[in-house]
């Protein structure tokens, strides 16, 4: 069967808007409702009372994640990279302050500082891993004390 040639039509910019049904127009014009469901058989003559939405003044509420989700996300993030969690300069100041109490005028080479940093960080990470149990989101001091007792270091 041979194809017929069609004449090109001039575009009008889309379809003409369809007429809305009365109940749809009323539903769109009504203020937004909270917690009140409109019945399926809504008719314009019905006397349904809808609560108006509280004024938000254009301020959007921040998104909240479930408890513990952000913590697990941070754990995964920090497991991927190989840098220290403890800031370098505050840790170096703390080490110098502690060593000044033991022996005055003690100096450190810059290459010697990563060693105590790595050891202390490994100890803290292990302690926190042991302290997290029972699917808790918050670490409680008694959990850390228990982890220290089990690990061999007295509280």
From Swiss-Prot:
Keywords: Chromosome, DNA-binding, Nucleosome core, Nucleus. Gene3D superfamilies: Histone, subunit A. One of its GO terms (cellular component) is nucleus. The nucleosome is a histone octamer containing two molecules each of H2A, H2B, H3 and H4 assembled in one H3-H4 heterotetramer and two H2A-H2B heterodimers. The octamer wraps approximately 147 bp of DNA. Pollen specific. Residues 34-59 are annotated as: Disordered. Its main location: nucleus. Core component of nucleosome. Nucleosomes wrap and compact DNA into chromatin, limiting DNA accessibility to the cellular machineries which require DNA as a template. Histones thereby play a central role in transcription regulation, DNA repair, DNA replication and chromosomal stability. DNA accessibility is regulated via a complex set of post-translational modifications of histones, also called histone code, and nucleosome remodeling. It is found in: Nucleus; Chromosome. CDD domains: HFD_H3. This is Histone H3-like 3. The keyword Ubl conjugation does not apply. Belongs to the histone H3 family. InterPro entries: Histone-fold (IPR009072), Histone_H2A/H2B/H3 (IPR007125), Histone_H3/CENP-A (IPR000164).
């Amino acid at each position: 069967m041979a194809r017929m040639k069609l004449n090109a039509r001039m575009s009008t910019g889309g379809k003409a808007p369809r007429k809305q049904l009365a109940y749809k127009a009323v539903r769109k014009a009504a203020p937004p409702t909270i917690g009140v469901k409109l019945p399926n058989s809504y008719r314009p003559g019905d006397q349904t009372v809808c609560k108006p939405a509280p004024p938000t003044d254009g301020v959007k509420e921040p998104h909240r994640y479930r408890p513990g989700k952000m913590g697990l996300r941070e754990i995964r993030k920090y497991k991927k990279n190989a840098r220290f969690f403890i800031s370098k300069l505050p840790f170096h100041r703390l080490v110098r302050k502690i060593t000044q109490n033991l022996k005055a005028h003690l100096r450190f080479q810059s290459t010697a500082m990563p060693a105590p940093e790595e050891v202390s960080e490994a100890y803290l990470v292990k302690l926190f891993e042991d302290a997290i149990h029972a699917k808790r989101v918050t670490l409680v001091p008694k959990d850390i004390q228990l982890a220290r007792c089990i690990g061999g270091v007295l509280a």
